[in-house]
Amino acid sequence: MQITNSLHTAILVTDLQRSEHFYGTVLGLAKIDRSLKYPGAWYQVGNYQIHLIVAPSSPTDNQNEKWGRNPHVAFAVADLEIAKQELLNHNYPIQASASGRPAVFTQDPDGNIIELSQQ
């Protein structure tokens, strides 16, 4: 077997409207059409996609001291300071990467961990 590309990450959410605000407005991802019947939303990030899937009983882990060591989605950002300010403006907590590199972690409204890294 040869894996040739990464296609998408599926993220469980409990409130689609709230999550669409986070991924579409706060993170600025481009929403794309989807033809599936179950509730959700798809976002395009370059050649990659983020699939929000509604799962009303999705478990969350709010222990932010270990965000970087938990499963997470990482996005590259052009300016980390602007990204941090945007998250804070929308009242999302941030945690600097313990590695010392230019990156922060936050959580979406359902507790899914998001890394923003300046490349």
Describe each region flagged by the PLM.
Residues K66-L87:
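Mid-chain, well-packed structural core segment of small domains
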Residues S57-Q63:
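A short, acidic/glycine-rich surface segment
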Residues M1-R18, P71-F75:
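N-terminal beta-strand motif that seeds the catalytic metal site of vicinal oxygen chelate
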Residues I11-I50:
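Core segments of cupin and vicinal oxygen chelate
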Residues K37-P39, R69, S99-P102:
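Short acidic/glycine-enriched loop/turn segments that link adjacent beta-strands
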